[in-house]
């Protein structure tokens, strides 16, 4: 009512999982039959916030701790080296959060002349701000997870990394 919608259909996520169980559950359904159940539509993104200046072309990066990318010294070093290597070739925009509501703590990423750190604020608009920035990026590089999957949905080429594959649904591979 509050949104002025009088009639609607509710699609519970369990319906999607049921329809595609043969693909990611028992693995008895191939890719082509699974695709017959899906219709992809563009993801609407808000504009970049007023006052936020971005390079004309850039690679968006988002590195954070999760089960598949634990906060270990060798991964921190590798991540820093990766961001620095990208920044030698093209501007980098580091997507960061100002608040942590789960276990996804940002990896420390280097400062540098071609590295732009953007903290998405206010925190309630974190995903909207990151989505707006990501939509403008030439590519995404970062931790395998929700932001990498968002890049795919936005049509942005991703390179997403994981150290060890566990604590993830088969559907997320």
List each language-model region with its residue ranges:
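Nucleotide-sugar donor-binding patch of glycosyltransferase catalytic domains
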Residues: 148-173
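A nucleotide-sugar donor-handling region in carbohydrate enzymes
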Residues: 2-64
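Alpha-helix capping/helix-boundary segments
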Residues: 99-100, 146-148
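Acidic donor-binding loop of glycosyltransferase active sites
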Residues: 135-141
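A short, glycine/small-residue-rich beta-strand->loop->alpha-helix junction that serves as a flexible
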Residues: 66-76
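Acidic, amphipathic alpha-helical patches
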Residues: 130
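Hydrophobic/aromatic beta-strand patches that form the interior of the parallel beta-sheet core
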Residues: 93, 141, 157-161
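Catalytic donor nucleotide-activated moiety binding site of glycosyltransferases and closely related
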Residues: 61-66, 79-127
């Amino acid at each position: 009512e509050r949104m002025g919608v009088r009639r609607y259909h509710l699609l519970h996520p369990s319906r999607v999982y049921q329809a595609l169980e043969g693909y990611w559950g028992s693995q008895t359904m191939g890719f082509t039959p699974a695709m017959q159940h899906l219709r992809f539509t563009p993801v609407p993104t808000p504009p970049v916030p007023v006052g936020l200046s971005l390079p004309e072309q850039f690679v968006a990066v988002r590195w954070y701790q999760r089960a598949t990318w634990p906060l270990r010294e060798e991964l921190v070093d590798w991540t820093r080296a990766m961001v620095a290597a990208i920044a030698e070739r093209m501007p980098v925009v580091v997507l960061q959060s100002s608040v942590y509501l789960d276990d996804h703590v940002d990896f420390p990423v280097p400062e540098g002349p071609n590295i732009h750190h953007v903290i998405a604020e206010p925190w309630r608009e974190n995903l909207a701000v990151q989505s707006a920035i990501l939509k403008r990026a030439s590519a995404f590089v970062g931790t395998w997870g929700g932001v990498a999957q968002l890049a795919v949905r936005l049509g942005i080429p991703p390179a997403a990394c994981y150290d060890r594959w566990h604590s993830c649904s088969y559907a997320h591979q």
